């Protein structure tokens, strides 16, 4: 009963705030939604404590959902170690975001609707991580996509919010369709979509092949690649990352919830959940490693030149997701989930601090129009500093324990893809430290560039916003140290059967014996980025400006500022051709052509022509009508007295045509 209550409490809170918000008021909506999410958090902590102490796993059968032929799908909830970790992360971050939003959105007239959306978002994420099969997971998958549309477009009178929400929806629909194809591939070959049955049958079908355009492809490779592309869209990996920075158009608590604990982490969760499949597909693991490392490097370079406060933090999310994915590609799924849980706390802290800064600065998000906030917002500055240091991987903070270990495992794999991931991830760590320090400089450490009246009215966060920041700061400092041995400690049996790693792919032991130089290199480069940015922006700012306006510097700056021209390529080369095909083929040839000719216009034209031909038979001569009656009588007699085989016998047809010509 406790497990079902945990799942449906956020849904009840969402319904109460959404349907009865007018009657219970703004405070009532805030209280109910925050309370239900908080209770879910408490219950998830109780459940994971029982799981750790007693090694329990739970499967709750609710009912049969779909039963059609060979397709049988039940509505079940699975509670294993992976699910419980995700539940703790989702519900704890969601509770703090709810509490923060109660004050941050206090002056918004639609607060009840906003709180309802947040709770619904949390509910669908819980459905996603507790699903016992791919179909139930897909319900939660689509639910978080739908809720992200509602939340990004919460201020629906703003054109940019409309465009950002539609963009997020469209990009995710593409990846969701490919994910669905992956699920259908699994069902077609295994005849089930339940996790346990599917994973148990993988060893049987792993050698199945099929021919596609003269290429021999493995069933497992195709299914894994399709599932990974679905995860790429949800977790904003390179090529499908376009929606992530635009999602900053929503309220800041939405950004914190999406980036820290819900939507973008769903792809990493799905990859870890399908680890028994991926372990039999070395090709897909290599692709995941390359895509993850490329994303980590790409996003860290783009973050160097951004000036929007929230977009800098958003690109850091994209970069950190790359680390999680290439950890999965290196078959170290527990390490990826470890980094996911660590990242959730310091990323939520960074976003909520950015919301406090934007709120204090009168909704200004351009960091060039800030400065000097360390004196005006001292508490927010300290919290943001803790989150930034944890993001950089500063020694003994939460981010350090997972981020550096991912890079060590990458080098210890002793493979081309592993070393590719190590070097790109290490360079990405340098850039991460650089743009984090740049953000600190412009927002907090430099002389202020804000208007005088804004500085006068700026104030630090109230208690309702300060409590979540303090708790997240605690997590950003200690969670990594506390949970490291449980997540990735040698000999830890915490994960049981929820994650499978092929013994030949496990590099955790090898990572312990790396040369010291390769272990320390990411930390050294992070410090170089930290002190390098500090030195350049404090003492050599003119040098940076001259470098930027130089011939090659300007080209490089534009390349990064335009996000490697991905938007330009997609809009001008892909979207334009697709739109032209949509107009010239789909609209003009099919919709207004084939369908119209076979449909309304064609039928109207045919019947008009037939009516005109029938009119010609009305000659007004009685002998014409008598002759037609005679022909009709002969025709009917022919039908009655002869077999149906002779229905169209040649004599009758010739006679009918001859008389018809005489009439004309």
Curated annotation (Swiss-Prot):
The chain crosses the membrane at residues 2-22, 28-48, 77-97, 120-140, 168-188, 210-230, 250-270, 285-305, 321-341, 342-362, 376-396, 424-444, 462-482, 521-541, 590-610, 614-634, 639-659. It is an enzyme of class 7 (translocase). GO terms for biological process: ATP synthesis coupled electron transport; electron transport coupled proton transport. Signal peptide: none annotated. Keywords: Electron transport, Membrane, Mitochondrion, Mitochondrion inner membrane, NAD, Respiratory chain, Translocase, Transmembrane, Transmembrane helix, Transport, Ubiquinone. Its main location: mitochondrion. It is a multi-pass membrane protein. This is NADH-ubiquinone oxidoreductase chain 5. It comes from Phytophthora infestans. The lineage of its organism: Eukaryota, Sar, Stramenopiles, Oomycota, Peronosporales.
């Amino acid at each position: 009963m406790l497990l079902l209550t945990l799942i449906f409490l956020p849904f009840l809170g969402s319904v109460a705030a959404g349907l009865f918000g007018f009657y219970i008021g703004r405070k009532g909506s805030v209280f109910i939604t925050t309370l239900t999410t908080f209770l879910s958090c408490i219950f998830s902590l109780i459940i994971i404590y029982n799981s750790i102490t007693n090694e329990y796993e739970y499967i709750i059968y609710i009912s049969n959902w779909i039963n059609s032929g060979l397709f049988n799908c039940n509505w079940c909830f699975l509670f294993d170690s992976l699910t419980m970790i995700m539940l703790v992360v989702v519900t704890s971050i969601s509770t703090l975001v709810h509490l923060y939003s109660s004050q941050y959105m206090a002056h918004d007239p639609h607060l009840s609707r906003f709180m309802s959306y947040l709770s619904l978002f949390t509910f669908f994420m819980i459905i996603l991580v507790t699903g016992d099969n791919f179909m139930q997971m897909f319900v939660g998958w689509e639910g978080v996509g739908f809720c992200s549309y509602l939340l990004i477009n919460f201020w629906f009178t703003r054109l940019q919010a409309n465009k950002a929400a539609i963009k997020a929806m469209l990009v995710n629909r593409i990846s969701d369709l490919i994910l669905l194809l992956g699920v259908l591939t699994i069902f077609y070959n295994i005849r089930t979509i339940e996790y346990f049955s599917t994973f148990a049958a993988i060893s049987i079908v792993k050698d199945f092949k099929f021919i596609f355009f003269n290429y021999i492809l493995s069933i497992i490779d195709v299914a894994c690649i399709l599932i990974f592309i679905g995860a790429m869209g949800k977790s904003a990996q390179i090529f499908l990352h376009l929606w992530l920075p635009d999602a900053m158009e929503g309220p800041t608590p939405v950004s914190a919830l999406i980036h820290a604990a819900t939507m973008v982490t769903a792809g990493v969760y799905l990859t870890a959940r399908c680890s028994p499949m991926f372990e039999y597909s070395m090709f897909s693991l290599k692709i995941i490693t390359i895509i993850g490392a490329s994303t980590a490097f790409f996003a860290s370079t783009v973050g160097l030149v951004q000036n929007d406060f929230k977009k800098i933090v958003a690109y850091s999310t994209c970069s950190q997701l790359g680390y999680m994915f290439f950890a999965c590609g290196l078959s170290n799924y527990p390490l990826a989930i470890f980094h996911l849980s660590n990242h959730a706390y310091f990323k939520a802290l960074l976003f909520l601090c950015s919301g406090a800064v934007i709120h204090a600065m009168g909704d200004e998000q351009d960091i060039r129009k800030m400065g000097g906030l360390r004196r005006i917002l001292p508490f927010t500055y300290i919290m943001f500093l803790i989150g930034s240091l944890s993001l950089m991987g500063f020694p003994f903070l939460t981010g350090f324990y997972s981020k550096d270990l991912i890079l060590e495992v990458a080098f210890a794999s002793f493979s081309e893809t592993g070393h590719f991931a190590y070097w790109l991830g290490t360079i990405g760590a340098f850039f991460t430290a650089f743009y984090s320090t740049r953000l600190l400089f412009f927002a907090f450490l430099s002389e202020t560039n804000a208007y005088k009246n804004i500085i006068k009215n700026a104030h630090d966060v109230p208690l309702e916003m300060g409590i979540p920041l303090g708790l997240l700061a605690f997590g950003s400092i200690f969670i990594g140290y506390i949970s490291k041995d449980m997540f990735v400690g040698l000999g830890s049996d915490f994960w049981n059967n929820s994650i499978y790693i092929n013994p030949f792919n496990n590099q955790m032991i090898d990572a312990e014996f790396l040369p010291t130089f390769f272990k320390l290199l990411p930390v050294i480069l992070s410090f170089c980025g930290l002190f390098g940015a500090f030195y350049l922006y404090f003492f050599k700012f003119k040098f940076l400006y001259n470098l930027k306006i130089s011939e090659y510097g300007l080209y490089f700056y534009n390349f990064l500022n335009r996000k490697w021209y991905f938007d330009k390529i997609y809009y001008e080369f892909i979207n334009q051709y697709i739109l032209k095909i949509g107009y010239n083929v789909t609209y003009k040839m099919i919709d207004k052509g084939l369908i119209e000719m076979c449909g309304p216009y064609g039928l109207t034209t045919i019947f008009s022509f037939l009516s005109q031909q029938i009119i010609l038979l009305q000659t007004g001569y009685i002998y014409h009508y008598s002759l037609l009656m005679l022909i009709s009588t002969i025709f009917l007699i022919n039908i009655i007295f002869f077999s149906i085989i002779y229905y169209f016998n040649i004599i009758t047809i010739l006679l009918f045509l001859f008389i018809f010509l005489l009439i004309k």
